[in-house]
Amino acid sequence: MPLVEKRYAQALLELSGSDINSIKEEFGDFTNLYNSDKDFRDFLNNPVVKTDKKQALIRSVFTDRLSKNMLNMILLLVSKHRTAEIPGIFNQFIQMANETANVLDMKIIMAAPMDEVQLETLREKFKKKYNAVAVNSTEIVDESLIGGLKVIIGDKVYDGSVKGRIESLTEIVSV
């Protein structure tokens, strides 16, 4: 993640205090609107439109819908011309909030679909390994793995796929 996104996310996390869950929800709703409404997104990212007009629109539409901290964050992003980074800041915020709450985010990439019992067993093993309170997982089927699976947690990759083993052997043989 770019440093800018990380800094804004960290600032919002510090401002959130005990309201972290409501900020998560508000920021998520705003980000969904930003991502889904092309006209709104184009308006906020348009360099020709004056900052005060953008802020006036944000205030008129969101003053009653967002908390003071969230509204001020959006207004700050508008004034600093950082609205294009809203999705990245949101993703970084969620990641930091989960780390603070000791929630493990993991991506499970498998060659073939796994049943829910297998997935839950895998989640539980990583939950214990990382001493996490809870686990959020995203499951993806990627047939190019040939067999097995890959688990990604932050920057760490656990590769138990056939494709990964073939690539490792190829590296050893070619050296």
UniProtKB/Swiss-Prot annotation:
GO molecular function, one term: proton-transporting ATP synthase activity, rotational mechanism
TM segment ranges: none
GO cellular component, one term: proton-transporting ATP synthase complex
Location(s) in or outside the cell: Cell membrane
Keyword line: ATP synthesis, Cell membrane, CF(1), Hydrogen ion transport, Ion transport, Membrane, Transport
Coiled coil: none
One Pfam family per UniProt: OSCP
Cited Gene3D superfamilies: N-terminal domain of the delta subunit of the F1F0-ATP synthase
Domain of life: Bacteria
Membrane topology listed for this record: Peripheral membrane protein
Protein family per UniProt: Belongs to the ATPase delta chain family.
Assembly and oligomerization: F-type ATPases have 2 components, F(1) - the catalytic core - and F(0) - the membrane proton channel. F(1) has five subunits: alpha(3), beta(3), gamma(1), delta(1), epsilon(1). F(0) has three main subunits: a(1), b(2) and c(10-14). The alpha and beta chains form an alternating ring which encloses part of the gamma chain. F(1) is attached to F(0) by a central stalk formed by the gamma and epsilon chains, while a peripheral stalk is formed by the delta and b chains.
Function, as annotated: F(1)F(0) ATP synthase produces ATP from ADP in the presence of a proton or sodium gradient. F-type ATPases consist of two structural domains, F(1) containing the extramembraneous catalytic core and F(0) containing the membrane proton channel, linked together by a central stalk and a peripheral stalk. During catalysis, ATP synthesis in the catalytic domain of F(1) is coupled via a rotary mechanism of the central stalk subunits to proton translocation. This protein is part of the stalk that links CF(0) to CF(1). It either transmits conformational changes from CF(0) to CF(1) or is implicated in proton conduction.
Name used for this protein in its record: ATP synthase subunit delta
Gene name tied to this protein: atpH
